[in-house]
């Protein structure tokens, strides 16, 4: 994991010459002040998404064009980015990858060049290839902005930010917080983004729990505590985040059996009881009920999974607003 992240960090330039955030590509190395600025800005946008508000829009991106380029499937991320852009009054174009010229062999950067020629202002990019959004950001003109919506198993910065927002909302601060991330860590861009953000924000007790086959070999370099037992790893934690098994990133024969995984690592009410009584349960989605999480827990009073989705709109509004210069 570290080799991939370090390689990515060497290629990333998220700031312009004036020191302003112009792309959001990774949370690795993003300063604490910048993360807090995004979270604070998102907090201001929460009121825009309030159901009681008659007009759920602000004009910050009026006249701007946001292109959603999703080369991997998505429900929550793509939809909340679209909602966020529209609530900022942007024009939103969702490129249908299956019918675009990339399906005919056009290169990624040639596609980008053509969309820039159509006056694109912001690209929101999800791609199966790690660091593809970084390649795009290094290629586009300086007036065009790129937001990474998840690249391979590398990073998912806006998911990490909305997770930080959720934790801060329910737990107020990160100092003294105990966070457990459970499941398929080795393939998870969400886990990597969360670990980087939590470390930057001062969380000193980050735990990862899973079978050895689903944990990167170099986790100790990130300063996290590694557990192979739920009973040990969940003791007295404030936050439990479960992750799905990413079968699409595994070779044949590597995929754990769902029942066997659930029996050992599924988040059940009994296991959740090992955490603090006011612990919150998080999941970036999509959930596989009965594999990494019990429905009783997913739908229970400690679950903030749907809050994550709601907060994601405000966080993505904040990110697009900030990179566009607001």
From Swiss-Prot:
Carbamoyl phosphate binds at residues 76-77, 126, 156, 159, 285-286. Pfam families: OTCace, OTCace_N. GO terms for cellular component: cytosol. InterPro entries: Asp/Orn_carbamoyltranf_P-bd, Asp/Orn_carbamoylTrfase, Asp/Orn_carbamoylTrfase_sf, Asp_carbamoyltransf, Asp_carbamoyltransf_Asp/Orn-bd. It catalyses: carbamoyl phosphate + L-aspartate = N-carbamoyl-L-aspartate + phosphate + H(+). L-aspartate binds at residues 104, 189, 244. Keywords: Pyrimidine biosynthesis, Transferase. One of its GO terms (molecular function) is aspartate carbamoyltransferase activity. The keyword Transferase applies. GO terms for biological process: 'de novo' pyrimidine nucleobase biosynthetic process; 'de novo' UMP biosynthetic process; amino acid metabolic process. It is an enzyme of class 2 (transferase). Its EC number is 2.1.3.2. Belongs to the aspartate/ornithine carbamoyltransferase superfamily. ATCase family. Catalyzes the condensation of carbamoyl phosphate and aspartate to form carbamoyl aspartate and inorganic phosphate, the committed step in the de novo pyrimidine nucleotide biosynthesis pathway. This is Aspartate carbamoyltransferase catalytic subunit. It comes from Polynucleobacter asymbioticus (strain DSM 18221 / CIP 109841 / QLW-P1DMWA-1).
């Amino acid at each position: 994991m570290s080799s991939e992240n370090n390689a990515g960090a060497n290629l990333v330039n998220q700031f312009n010459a004036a020191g302003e955030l112009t792309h959001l590509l990774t949370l690795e190395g993003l300063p604490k002040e910048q993360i807090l600025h995004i979270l604070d800005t998102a907090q201001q946008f929460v009121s825009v998404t309030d159901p009681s508000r008659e007009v759920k829009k602000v004009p910050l991106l009026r006249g701007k064009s946001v292109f959603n380029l999703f080369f991997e499937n998505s429900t929550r991320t793509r939809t909340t980015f679209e909602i966020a852009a529209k609530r900022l009054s942007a024009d939103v174009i969702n490129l249908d990858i299956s019918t675009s010229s990339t399906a005919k062999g056009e290169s990624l950067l040639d596609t980008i060049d053509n969309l820039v020629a159509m006056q694109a202002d912001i690209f929101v990019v999800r791609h199966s290839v790690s660091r593809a959004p970084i390649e795009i950001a290094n290629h586009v003109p300086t007036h065009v902005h790129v937001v990474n919506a998840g690249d391979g198993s590398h990073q998912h910065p806006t998911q990490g930010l909305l997770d930080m927002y959720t934790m801060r909302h329910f737990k107020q601060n990160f100092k003294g917080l105990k966070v457990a991330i459970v499941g398929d860590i080795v393939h998870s861009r969400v886990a990597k983004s969360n670990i980087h953000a939590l470390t930057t924000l001062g969380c000193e007790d980050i735990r990862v729990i899973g079978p050895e086959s689903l944990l990167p070999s170099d986790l100790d370099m990130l300063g996290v505590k590694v557990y192979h037992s739920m009973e040990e790893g969940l003791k007295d934690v404030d936050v439990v985040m479960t992750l799905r098994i990413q079968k699409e990133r595994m070779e044949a024969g590597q995929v754990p059996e769902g029942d066997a995984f659930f029996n050992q690592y599924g988040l059940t009410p009994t296991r959740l009881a090992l955490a603090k009584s006011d612990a919150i349960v998080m999941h970036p989605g999509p959930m596989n009920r009965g594999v990494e999480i019990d429905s009783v827990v997913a739908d229970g009073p400690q679950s903030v999974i749907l809050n994550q989705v709601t907060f994601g709109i405000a966080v993505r509004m904040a990110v697009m607003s900030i990179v566009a210069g607001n």
